[in-house]
Amino acid sequence: MIQTTVLHPKHLEAGAKMVDFHGWEMPINYGSQLEEHHAVRTDAGMFDVSHMTIVDLTGERVKAFLQHLLANDVAKLTVPGKALYSGMLNPDGGVIDDLITYYLTDTFYRLVVNSATREKDLAWIRHHAIDFAVSVTERPELAMIAVQGPNAKAKAAKVFTPEQNAAVEGMKPFFGVQAGDLFIATTGYTGEDGYEIVVPQEKACDLWQALLDNGVAPCGLGARDTLRLEAGMNLYSQDMDESISPLAANMAWTLAFEPASRQFIGRAALEAQKAAGTQLKQVGLVMEEKGVLRAGMPVTFTTASGEKREGVITSGSFSPTLGYSIALARVPRDIGEQAEVEIRKKLVTVKVTKPAFVRNGQKLV
């Protein structure tokens, strides 16, 4: 049985092309993926992300629980509302999921996890919560709308109440605040400014319509994917999964090895990988000639000593902002500034870059 979000009627009303996304019927576009992409890079667009899973954690030992569960350290969160991005790892150091954690009070944290991993995430979290007497509450009655782009905050301000505007004034990135019936967070998956707004289901359609009336363009999963790829943001199950180390997925910055006494799940495996120094790494690829880089394509190169090496593209697409093809790839660490990708039985030279291409409207390559 395919699931739908509370905003499903609004998508049909807007003429969306609907697709099955991990068991959810979601909009892939509303006519033009390209126009939706550019709307977010140059103005303001909105996405229905109500399929994401919101999980509230409460208990006296909830901080200690999250310090055990997550590879990043929630002890960094000292101001209520502050959030961090982290991997949730298995004992082998593979990524069960990547998620955002909000610190709300000393006994209350909120997680936002991926929809495709919902069941295994909840089972894993609940299993480990038992030892810490932490209560795990899924919040399916909440919907979520992401409003993204250089003009997103200004347009959202027209929809917020004066109290909500006061609550978000001057709020830095990666913060969330409960303001009236909305939980408003300065997070996103596009590389642009904006909010992710958690709203009670019964008020979601009105909020969507109000944003629409104020010139925010509805955007589908197609544009969401090209935007996050340009920003160099991982997509779970493509760029990392339970068999992939965060060290091989450009997530080393999310690993908190200090203090040494914090024994988070997967720590020993990661320390062994670091000591071995043989872990693959994630890079960006740029191909300015015609053709499109796609996930699964092999990436080959020759080292300075003449040895042949091979990696693989994990995410690839035409970049609407740059006007040529880009990709994220997992490759041996000794890759140089160029590599080759086989496209239609022809080897094409690609430039190797850092794994981020566009942020805040600025081209990085």
Swiss-Prot record:
Highest taxon, organism lineage: Bacteria
Disulfide bond entries: none
Top-level EC class: transferase
Keyword Transferase attributed: yes
GO cellular component terms, A-Z: cytosol; glycine cleavage complex
Sorted UniProt keywords: Aminotransferase, Transferase
EC number of this enzyme: 2.1.2.10
Cited Gene3D superfamilies: Aminomethyltransferase beta-barrel domains, Aminomethyltransferase fragment, Probable tRNA modification gtpase trme, domain 1
GO process terms (BP): glycine decarboxylation via glycine cleavage system
UniProt keyword Ribosomal protein, yes or no: no
Complex formation: The glycine cleavage system is composed of four proteins: P, T, L and H.
HAMAP family: GcvT (MF_00259)
Similarity section: Belongs to the GcvT family.
Its biological purpose: The glycine cleavage system catalyzes the degradation of glycine.
Protein name: Aminomethyltransferase
